[in-house]
Amino acid sequence: MFNKKKEDKMKAKDVITQMTSGDTFYITYYAKKHQAIITRKGTWTKPNTDIQGKHFVSKGNDIFVYWDLDAMPNDNGNQWRQATNPMRVKL
């Protein structure tokens, strides 16, 4: 069966290159929470710190943790979000 999500996903090394090559980026991915494809503005590094995002693989999916500049902070001031199998990352 044809799986469009897998076909559209970027390679992990290309995503990391885009996310770390500039100050900010736009990342597009399917968000289960919203049941929709979303685009967010983010950074690889938490602002005013040297704390970086990360990449890992879980159950065959590429997971990217990034600082979401569009997000409302939670009670702890956290704006870290995770994107699973991003379709696009651009500066």
Question: What residue ranges belong to the model's regions?
Answer:
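Mixed-charge, Lys/Arg-rich low-complexity intrinsically disordered regions
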Residues: 2-17
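Short, 15-30-residue, compositionally biased linear elements
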Residues: 17-21, 59
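A short, Trp-centered hydrophobic/proline-enriched beta-strand micro-motif
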Residues: 21-29
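Acidic, low-complexity, intrinsically disordered interaction modules
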Residues: 38-59, 74-75
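Short, compact, well-ordered microdomains
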Residues: 61-91
